[in-house]
């Protein structure tokens, strides 16, 4: 496979990750209005004023603009080169373009017209899908280079494992929205203790922001336990299928790091590094879970053909 196409895939995936984390940086630093209510200009200028909020917001917009060029190029090139090898290519190329433009549109509308916490949470959720689409498209490019298709040999995925893969993917997306809602309602430090909320009221939440925070913690705890269950099933029953075995090991690592970074956000009183790490780990986890969905689609297709 063309080395330039591989390089483009890696670069595009990296830039999409930068855009995703950059959006979290804009939110964490309160830089959403760093360029005023103007888009694409920044206070009527192409280049930003030399203050942190304007530079952060402008940099996020610039990275988003670069990502549009890269994603369009990657989608078209991969569609031309690897569609004959992988039938999923066209779907992923279209997905990456559609969700990228939805992501950009929501961001622009939020700047110009203002937005609420629910809309901004939706913006982050769409950004995750956009990133995952590009990530999987890049994986396909590398897989297409395997002359014997060693990475995509026929799989055997039982109904129990399919349930875990699909269920955890859907549920993790819901948990992502609860986390984004925590961020956009400024509820990150509503509960100063872990795992309970505070010394008051036996550690239970008493007002809206505390309920938002504890609701996210409860949802995240269930996700953590569910991934442990799925990982144990993979370790005991899928040792010979590397994509599934190592995929769940990766998920277990990412969800553990995700939980630790979330705890450190509370104890560090919203340290920026931990907050950005929290966004990074969930992006990695979601990418692996989306790849599982691709494996299921392949398995079902090959089962119908046999």
Swiss-Prot record:
The protein's required cofactors: heme b
Principal place of residence: membrane
Organism superkingdom: Bacteria
Catalytic activity annotation: Fe(II)-heme o + 2 A + H2O = Fe(II)-heme a + 2 AH2
First-tier enzyme category under EC: oxidoreductase
Binding site for heme o: 60, 123
Reported impact of residue 35 to A: Abolishes catalytic activity
Active site: 57
Any one annotated GO CC term: plasma membrane
Effect of residue 60 to L: Inactive. Contains heme B and heme O, with mainly heme O bound to CtaA
Regions crossing the membrane: 3-25, 52-78, 89-113, 116-139, 160-185, 211-236, 243-268, 272-294
Membrane topology designation: Multi-pass membrane protein
Keyword tags: Cell membrane, Disulfide bond, Heme biosynthesis, Iron, Membrane, Metal-binding, Oxidoreductase, Transmembrane, Transmembrane helix
Cytoplasmic side: 1-2, 79-88, 140-159, 237-242, 295-306
Family to which the UniProt record says this protein belongs: Belongs to the COX15/CtaA family. Type 1 subfamily.
Domains: entry comment: The N-half (TM1-TM4) and C-half (TM5-TM8) domains are connected by an intracellular loop. Each domain is formed from four-helix bundles and they align in a pseudo twofold symmetry manner. The N-half domain is the substrate-heme O binding domain and the C-half domain is the cofactor heme B binding domain. The cysteines of disulfide bond Cys-35 and Cys-42 may be involved in transfer of reducing equivalents from quinol in the membrane to the active site of the enzyme.
Subunit structure: Interacts with CtaB.
Protein name: Heme A synthase
Lineage: Bacteria, Bacillati, Bacillota, Bacilli, Bacillales
